[in-house]
Amino acid sequence: MYTIRRTKDFEISIKRLARSGIKISLKKKIEQTIDLLASGKRLPESYKDHQLNGELSKYRECHIKGDLLLIYKIERESLVLILVNIGSHSQLF
């Protein structure tokens, strides 16, 4: 089990999502995704989980639902899951 660490960008983005009136079902999907990652389990193919390229190559990205993306990093040596940011493709890139 990984310890979860949230970056400031992630905290700001998740608050923005909450203010936008996020549906309970989507909130649960976000929590389930984070729980799966923290448990060390592989995400199902539907999440389109992949490593990013270029300057962001040390991070991974998964599609939580539609255009809602989660950028994260797993530090296996220290057993830490870092939640980097969350949002739409246009918000993140």
Where in this protein do the model-derived segments appear?
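Catalytic Cys-His active-site segments of thiol-dependent hydrolases/isopeptidases
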Residues: 83-85
